[in-house]
Amino acid sequence: MLDEEGRELPRGSTGRLAVTGPTGCRYLDDERQRDYVQHGWNVTGDLYRVDEDGYFWFVARADDMIVSAGYNIAGPEVEWALLAHAAVRECAVVAAQDPERGTVVKACVVLAPGKAASPELVKELQDFVKQRIAPYKYPRVIEFMDALPKTATGKLQRKALRT
């Protein structure tokens, strides 16, 4: 587990998963070398937490991590909380620009059949998330959508939601 400067982190910390060894990932004469090989480590792009027993726990893809007012918020954790609500059929969480906090959590929500978007439902979903995970992680922006953008193979296109 590494921090942003490539220093190893102690157990209990969340950081970038990286591996090193006699073999590994090399991009000779390729710009990707700078992104994926740093300080002698092959950086995976995943964030993990190592518990006190040495077990690794997936937190999020590094590009799915949202930093809001100095807090690190894993988008998938917010998604799991939202998906537990009966009104939510599908959702995706991304960062949205905010003048005060830098970024905030934005949830793009596809409602379950028979459910209707309303300001009351926005508040209900926000309160629901606050009861399940740390309150500072709740989505400050909720956008209701008919469908989430996906590729032909069904993979979510988060980039399209960040605009």
Annotated model-derived regions:
Residues 142-145:
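General small-molecule cofactor/ligand-binding pocket signal
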Residues 31:
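Noncatalytic, basic helical substrate-engagement surface that gates or grips nucleic-acid strands
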Residues 8, 18-21, 25-26, 35, ...:
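AMP-binding/adenylate-forming catalytic core of the ANL superfamily
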Residues 2-3, 20:
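Short beta-strand-to-turn element immediately C-terminal to the catalytic PLP-Schiff-base lysine
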